[in-house]
Each structure stands twice: as C-alpha cells, then as structure tokens.
Regions:
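Short acidic-glycine-tyrosine-enriched beta hairpin
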Residues: 1-2, 117-137
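Ligand-binding loop in jelly-roll beta-barrel domains
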Residues: 6-26, 135-155
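Surface-exposed loop/turn positions
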Residues: 7, 93, 101, 129, ...
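Non-heme Fe(II)/2-oxoglutarate
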Residues: 14-16, 22-25, 29-40, 106, ...
Length: 155
C-alpha cells in the first residue's frame, strides 16, 4: 500500500510494516486506542492541529500493484520524496549506486543475506533488520543465504 502524506492511517497489533515517509518532524495523533505511555498516562492527541494537515481527497485504491519477479528489482513507489523497490533474491547480486546521489536503506523482510559495500565492509542482515548505506557508497554485493527479500529505498 502507498498512502501519500496527510492520510489518516492505523497499524494493527502484530503487523510487520515498513513505514517509509518523507522527512518531517511532525506526527499528529488523532486517536490512540486509549493506550498508555510508560508512566500509565494516555498519550497526547492532536485532533485540532491535524485538521489542517489531513488530505481529504478520496482515492479508490491505495494498493501498490506490481508483478513479483525473482532476482531483479521491482519498482513499488516513486514519488517526489523517495523511491522504493523490492528485491526477491535466490541468487547473489551486485547493486550499482554510482549514479545515485542519495543514501540507500535496505529493509530485510524475509530470509537473510550478507551485504558487502565497496569498502569491503560485510554485514549479515536478517528478516526484520535494516541497513543504511552512506551516499558515498557506489556498489553493494548482496550474497543471499538461500533466499532474501528486501525493500530498497532512497531519496
């Protein structure tokens, strides 16, 4: 799913999601299911402030439709604020970031892989973990441990 900025959304218990968003220092909480903070207090709501930030236009469908492919990138979202692709790998792959002027984030959703950057630094990344590459990284070698599925995001 892709919800543009200004859309009211809620995340249910037990969901594993990647919430990729544009840079912002503001989050408005308009309802909090009566949850309590660590001290037992209900968290502050921002109902009045949120009224000016909500995008009230209606979309028919927020699903991100794509055709799943193995061993090649599949574009999910490209907007003015970020681009996100999904990789479903059963084979090793080298990713070229030499033309990209941005940091890159990989979020491993399934399986695991070892990533090695162009400086020779290697890190194993497992499902539920993420890794941030500096904008100076020009190439990343992904060595799959059987299978790895991850999101790639950059600005």
């Amino acid at each position: 799913f892709f919800l543009p900025a200004g859309r009211i959304h809620s995340i249910g218990a037990g969901c594993f999601i990647a919430e990729i968003q544009q840079t912002s220092n503001v989050t408005y909480r308009i309802y909090d299911f009566n949850r309590k903070d660590k001290d037992g207090n209900t968290r502050e709501l921002h109902t009045e402030l949120s009224k000016d930030a909500i995008d009230y236009s209606v979309e028919e469908d927020y699903r991100t439709n794509y055709t799943a492919k193995q061993n090649e990138p599949v574009d999910l979202v490209s907007c003015p604020y970020f681009t996100t692709s999904v990789y479903d790998l059963t084979e090793d792959m080298t990713l070229d970031y030499s033309e990209l002027d941005s940091f890159v984030i990989h979020i491993c959703m399934e399986g695991s892989c070892t990533v090695t950057d162009d400086q020779g630094t290697s890190v194993e990344v497992k499902a539920g973990e993420s890794i941030l590459y500096a904008a100076t990284t020009k190439e990343v070698k992904v060595t799959v441990n059987g299978h790895a599925k991850f999101l790639e995001t950059y600005v």
